[in-house]
Structures are given as C-alpha cells and as structure tokens.
Design a protein with these regions (language model features):
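Glycoside hydrolase catalytic-domain groove-lining segments
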Residues: 171, 177-232, 236-302
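Active-site beta-loop-alpha junctions enriched in small/polar residues
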Residues: 4-9, 43-45, 95-99, 160-163, ...
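Catalytic domains of carbohydrate-active enzymes, especially glycoside hydrolases
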Residues: 21-48, 150-155, 251, 257-261
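Glycine-rich, aromatic-flanked loop segments that form ligand/cofactor-binding clefts
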Residues: 1, 35-46, 74-122, 157-160, ...
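Aromatic-lined substrate-binding rim segments of carbohydrate-active enzymes
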Residues: 24-27, 40-95, 182-210, 278
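Active-site-adjacent "subsite" loops/lids of carbohydrate-active enzymes
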Residues: 3-21, 76, 81, 91-92, ...
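Aromatic- and acidic-residue-enriched segments that line the glycan-binding/catalytic groove
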Residues: 48-63, 98-124, 160-183, 229-239
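The substrate-binding groove and active-site-proximal loops of carbohydrate-active enzymes
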Residues: 7-17, 57-73, 123-141, 183-196, ...
Length: 302
C-alpha cells in the first residue's frame, strides 16, 4: 500500500485539472511498482477532501477552509474511480481527534468547533476533540458512517494520531472530562487508553453495520511498548503507543476491532531493533507500504 497525504500543502490551491493529472500520474507509477492499495487522506483536521454534509472543505485542497473547489469536484470520489480502474483498493484516511493544525487560521462556520466548542481542547498550539467525551466519539463515528455509506471505499484508515504526541512541560487538558466521565478509573492513563479503545471498537461496529465488507485499519507508531516496560515489547527505547499515545494496539488486534495493523517503522533498514520488532508483529501486520510524499509537519515521525 501507499499513502497519499494532503497536509504538506502539495495540493493546496492547485487547479482541479492539474491535481487530477498529478494524482493519475502517481497512481500509474504506483501501479507499475506493484501497489494494490492507496491510503488517501480525506480528513486532516475535522475538514474534508470530499463533499461532506458535516464538515468544511479542507484548506489543504482550496487554500481556504470552507471554500469549495471551483469545479465542485470531489477528490475522494475521483480517487475511488481511478483506483478501481486499476484494480487498486481505496482506503479513506481520517485523523479522528485532530481538529486544527498550527498553520490553520480562521475556522469555517461549518467546522464542528464553530458549532460545538465544548467538545474541544487546546494542546501544543493545536485543537483536538476531547477523547474523554462520549459526544466526541459519537461525532467521529457519524463522520465514518457518512463516508462508508455514501462512498464505495474499501476501507477506513487511521494513522498514529490518537492522543497527541506529548509536548514537554504541557499536560493534556482533560480534567473536566475525567471528572465527568471517569467511569470509575483511578489512573488517568488507563482511562485515556479506554477512551481510545471504545472509539476503535465503535468505529469497527459502525463500519460493520454499514457495509460488512469494508475494512477498518490502523497504521500506528512503530513501538507498542519498550521491552523494559513489557515482556511483549520490542528492544527499543523510544516513545510508546501504550504509554504515550494511549493506544493499546495489541488489544485492538486481539479483539478483532481492526482488520489490519501497519506499524510505522521510521528507523532505517538494518536498524538493530528491526528484526526483533518484526518477530513480534508477524501475526498482526498484514500489509506493508510507503508514503508517496513526505511525512506530516510537526508529526514527530523521524
């Protein structure tokens, strides 16, 4: 599989016909390389690279959030058609919690923050749905349901953006939601993990209810846990999904809540920990791939 993202701005303000030519050229090259699945980013910050009844057109498409493309074309529909012509799958890639990146100025009146600011928190200069709020999960599942119902996608895809990457010296501001919806948890870390677990389970159920043949997959950060913290972990000493992003990926795989898991292994080929990590994920990682363009800015992916 190959990822085609939008947040580096390579499509921003690009004329429709030129963008179509760029995408077709990428698909042709990827097909020649043997790629059979395209993971196309359609929701980067509670916006849309498709015609959404709930969220604004993305600034990463037109340059201004909420501004429709002049020809009223639909990039997601275009990519579905072009991928299927080539016997490729199209996986619609959404970022669930992130609602505003650092480079975004004014939000569209159609943006969910403009309508329901109580669902959001500010952290590290960005805006996020509060994962601790049941209404946040309900809203995200509504977006998933809309995409799966109206588009002939082969999968819904989420990458490594669960709780945000830690910002040194800043605590994620969820005191209010923890007090209101703590569900008896005494350790906040366990509660945060459960918030993400519930969302993953509910997205899985949403997809199955709409179209049972559509897959739901994730491409989380490449370290589940370091072995010094967990015997199931890898011989690594880096940031951990379980402890830092509150993503218990192993639980999702074991419970069948995701159809595929593609860890993002950003270290170089031949890294001393690579073989050890691979032996730990053979039964869980069913696809591999690469990013057609550069990693997202401020992503922590190095």
């Amino acid at each position: 599989g190959a990822w085609i993202q939008c947040v580096n701005g390579q499509f921003q303000g690009m004329p429709t016909e030129k963008m179509k030519k760029v995408l077709v050229s990428q698909l042709d090259n990827l097909q020649k390389a043997g790629i059979n699945a395209i993971i196309f980013q359609v929701r980067a910050e509670a916006d849309a690279l498709y015609k959404s009844p709930y969220e604004p057109w993305s600034r990463f498409l037109t340059g201004v959030q909420g501004k429709a493309p002049s020809s009223m074309w639909d990039p997601l529909q275009f990519m579905i058609e072009e991928c299927h012509k080539r016997n490729m799958e199209l996986h619609a890639w959404i970022n669930p919690y992130r609602a505003k990146t650092k480079g975004t100025g004014a939000l569209s009146p159609m943006h969910p923050y403009s309508k329901n600011p109580e669902l959001f928190v500010q952290y590290a200069g960005q805006l996020y749905f509060d994962p601790g709020l049941p209404e946040s999960r309900k809203y995200i599942c509504k977006i998933v349901r809309d995409i799966v119902t109206r588009y002939d996608v082969d999968a819904i895809h989420m990458d490594d953006y669960f709780y945000p990457y830690p910002n040194p010296g800043e605590e994620f501001p969820d005191n209010v939601s923890f007090a209101a919806y703590g569900r008896g948890f005494t350790r906040r870390a366990d509660w945060r993990r459960d918030n993400v677990n519930v969302l993953i389970k509910e997205i899985h159920e949403t997809v199955r209810e709409c179209k049972p043949w559509v897959k739901f997959g994730v491409s989380p950060f490449g370290i589940y846990r370091n072995k010094k913290n967990d015997p199931n972990g890898s011989e690594t000493n880096g940031l951990q999904n379980y402890d830092d992003l509150y993503a218990d990926v192993l639980l999702w795989v074991n419970n069948g809540w995701v159809d595929y898991n593609i860890p993002q292994i950003y270290w170089e080929i031949g890294h001393s920990s690579s073989a050890v990590y691979r032996s730990g994920c053979d039964t869980h990682c069913i696809e591999s791939g690469f990013d057609e363009s550069e990693p997202e800015p401020d992503s922590g992916k190095v």
